[in-house]
């Protein structure tokens, strides 16, 4: 695996590697389907690293697309959710899901919002004010969002200015 798609400004020499094996957890989100169908707002999923947020997001994407029949735009910046290779998703994320992989989140959300007319937008690991700005824009357009953040509990979100703004939205 090379570093060609990543915008490095320094040497792209690799000194260490961390290997994460993504896996599908069928029906992981099935109990949330009725709630998602009736929830009028967007959803923020918080948890510490390794808690299963990305696995939950993957299954929620499939549920919203296939079970609820909604148009979904999936922002998969690091190829973790759909695991696209050669233009094909290796994980089932739904028949009505448009995937943009390998593109910075804020840029990908803007492109998907303007070109794919999503009813839902799914985004993993919000970490930048630019991400939140585009999420607000999507919300103003009537797009429902599901996003994840790293936080062990609600207090962690409230103490971080970036995430505090999400709780107020």
Feature roles, as predicted:
Residues 37, 64-112:
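P-loop NTPase switch/communication element
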